[in-house]
């Protein structure tokens, strides 16, 4: 989108080792960018870790190869790559296909495309990163894709593992990798986390840290890099109990959803409430939908505009075989829709594979309210005889017999064969088959009473790519402040008779420079790198006036800068606007005697008078967003009303189909959430438009926040 500019000079990330020509995909943050990132992570922790009571961890970035072999990363963590047959240059195959299709859909000659062909290309693009090597080769060949740099032919796509390999220790005999995600550290520490949480689920663990991926073709600034910060959450929950106690608080939030069925049909977004998405089976369960909604609220709170945010469901061939449902939060940027946050229901896969490989029970046990009698198969036999007969294979035989008993039916089938013929064939690990006899083993059906349930929890995982979200924030909060006087002067100069070409070119250059000088980042105050600038307007102002203001701001935790430059106050304001500093305090020669300063707000440029003693605390409250500028403006003497606020500077608000439930006082005096009722009609399955349906209701009996029930005629 043209309204999203590239980074300005203040926030451009620096290429790593820039004085040595840089390295693709590696970046350093400067002072302003680093401050925004730290503030972003602080808001993230407050929004998720604090509010949800999560257990935060910090795990090592060096990971033994055995861990990532078990998780599947060694074998499957790869992108498909093609090479230029002439130069050997490497390209990511799916992105090359996407770029080619984008050019066909929007470039020269695109208007001649038939509707059916346009639809086909859009569907191919939607599936590009889910194709097998053979399917991708077929599409690249069909579209006659060649190397974008040399025009030469490309090799067939082949997998390229994205992990950085290393060795741990001086002997070099322990292979390892730089972690490609932070999640595995939390999975292998699950047992300790469960103990810390007193053995109870649901609970969530989280981690903020660096991950590494050896990207084939890094590009687009922070969007595709080789080292990046992730903030990941692993929410552990009973596999059959994926309701969420706080779901009603977000059920009325309306989101832009892009379900898989729409991606393969009309390509339309669906506007619907989170509650209706669960009721209609669009999102698999309440817990997954809850985190999707919480992510939407978080992204909007840090400056992402709701109209530039959508949630796209993974196609069936994109998801891992163990995943139940996956939704990506995508932010609209200059390069298109960019995946920034993944939400996946990973089932119990990770804990299951690590449990099996480590021979450690990564399970949860909890007492049953009423003991249950369950059918069991009891095995008897002569283990000594089996040991002598099977020798080295006996361990595998015993494991296969135990598995048959656990399953029940296979063991009774073995007994039936023993009763009928005196022998039974047993398949063991490795594909071999052994013969059992009646004097070796027997099986008997029975029952036993169990008093506790043992289960492997499912995992709901929201995973945040911090750098990508920051780039989205930079693009969504940037605007050029209109300057009516400069525009009028430029128009008058252009209209002046006799203006020469040289004069016009000079004027155009000046206008471009003016645009840069009036660049503004409309960061929310909590995200701004510096909260307030203290402008000293007169060289006669003694330090004894300025220093106490700065000292009190520092004591209150408010970051500030002092600007006593000799440039005009307008230029000094512009410099701070470009840094996204939301507030400015002006101190003049009369401040000492009057006890007053003026406070300027960045986006409206309005100013009010404040008492010197009150200013630091008011600025602190504004920076923490516990009060608003509108309140301050209404309660204090106005110096000037400023200018109309630019549309891109107006803080966007999420849309609610119905407001979240308000707390109601119970008989015991504690707050209990009210029971909400969602009355918005669910959307049609594919068209994305609302159609009359039976209203969705909320039941709250016996639950903290209630849960949604399916209507009589749920969405197919």
Task: Give the positions of each predicted feature.
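NTP/phosphate- and nucleic-acid-binding module
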Residues: 1-716
């Amino acid at each position: 989108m043209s309204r999203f500019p590239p980074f300005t000079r203040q926030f451009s990330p620096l290429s790593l080792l820039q004085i040595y020509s840089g390295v693709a995909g590696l970046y350093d943050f400067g002072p302003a960018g680093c401050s925004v990132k730290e503030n972003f992570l602080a808001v993230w922790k407050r929004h998720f870790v604090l509010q949800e009571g999560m257990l935060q961890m910090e795990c090592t970035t060096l990971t033994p190869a055995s861990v990532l072999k078990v998780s599947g990363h060694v074998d499957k963590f790869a992108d498909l790559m093609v090479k230029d047959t002439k130069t050997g240059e490497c390209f990511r195959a799916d992105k090359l296909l996407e770029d080619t299709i984008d050019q066909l859909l929007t470039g020269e000659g695109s208007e001649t495309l038939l509707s059916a062909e346009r639809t086909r290309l859009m569907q191919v693009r939607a599936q590009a990163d889910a194709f097998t090597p053979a399917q991708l080769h077929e599409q690249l060949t069909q579209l006659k894709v060649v190397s974008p740099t040399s025009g030469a032919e490309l090799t067939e796509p082949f997998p390229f593992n994205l992990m950085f390999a290393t060795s741990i220790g001086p002997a070099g005999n322990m292979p390892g990798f730089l972690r490609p995600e932070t999640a595995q550290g939390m999975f292998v520490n699950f047992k300790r986390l469960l103990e810390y949480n007193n053995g109870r689920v649901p609970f969530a663990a989280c981690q903020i840290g660096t991950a590494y991926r050896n990207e084939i073709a890094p590009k687009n600034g922070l969007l595709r890099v080789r080292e990046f910060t992730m903030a990941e959450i692993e929410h552990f929950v009973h596999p059959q109990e994926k309701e969420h106690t706080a779901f009603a608080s977000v059920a009325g939030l309306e989101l832009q959803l892009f379900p898989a069925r729409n991606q393969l049909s009309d390509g339309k977004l669906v506007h619907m409430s989170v509650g209706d998405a669960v009721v209609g089976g669009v999102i698999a369960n309440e817990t997954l939908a809850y985190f999707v909604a919480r992510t939407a609220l978080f992204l909007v709170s840090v400056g992402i505009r709701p109209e530039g945010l959508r949630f796209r469901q993974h196609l069936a061939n994109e998801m891992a075989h163990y995943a139940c449902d996956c939704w990506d939060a995508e932010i609209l940027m200059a390069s298109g829709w960019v995946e920034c946050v993944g939400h996946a229901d990973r089932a119990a896969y990770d804990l299951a594979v690590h449990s099996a490989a480590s021979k450690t029970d990564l399970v949860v046990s909890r007492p049953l309210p009423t003991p249950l009698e369950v059918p069991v198969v009891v095995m008897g036999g002569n283990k000594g005889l089996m040991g002598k007969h099977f020798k080295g294979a006996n361990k595998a035989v015993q494991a296969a017999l135990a598995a048959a008993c656990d399953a029940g039916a296979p063991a009774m089938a073995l007994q039936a064969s023993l009763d009928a013929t005196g022998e039974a064939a047993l398949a063991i690990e490795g594909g071999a088959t052994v013969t059992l006899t009646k004097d070796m083993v027997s099986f008997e059906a029975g029952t036993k009473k169990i008093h506790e349930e043992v289960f492997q929890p499912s995992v709901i995982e929201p995973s945040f790519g911090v750098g990508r979200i920051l780039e989205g924030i930079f693009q969504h909060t940037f605007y050029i402040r209109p300057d009516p006087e400069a525009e009028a002067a430029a128009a008058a100069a252009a209209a002046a008779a006799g203006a020469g070409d040289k004069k016009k070119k000079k004027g155009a250059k000046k206008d471009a420079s003016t645009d840069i000088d009036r660049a503004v980042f409309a960061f929310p105050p909590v995200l701004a790198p510096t909260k307030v600038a203290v402008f000293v307007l007169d060289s006669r102002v003694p330090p004894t006036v300025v220093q106490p203001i700065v000292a009190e701001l520092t004591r209150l935790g408010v970051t500030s800068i002092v600007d006593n430059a000799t440039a005009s106050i307008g230029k000094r304001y512009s410099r701070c606007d470009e840094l996204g500093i939301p507030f400015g305090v002006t101190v003049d020669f009369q401040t000492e005697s009057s006890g007053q300063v003026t406070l300027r707000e960045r986006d409206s440029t309005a100013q009010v008078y404040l008492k010197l003693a009150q200013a630091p605390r008011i600025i602190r409250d504004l920076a923490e967003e516990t009060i608003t500028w509108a309140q301050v403006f209404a309660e204090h003497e106005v110096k000037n009303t400023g200018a109309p606020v630019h549309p891109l500077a107006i803080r966007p608000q999420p849309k609610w189909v119905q407001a979240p439930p308000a707390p109601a006082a119970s008989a015991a005096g504690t707050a209990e959430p009210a029971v909400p009722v969602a009355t918005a009609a669910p959307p049609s399955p594919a068209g994305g438009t609302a159609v009359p349906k039976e209203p969705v209701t909320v039941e709250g009996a016996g639950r903290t926040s209630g849960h949604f029930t399916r209507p009589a005629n749920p969405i197919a």
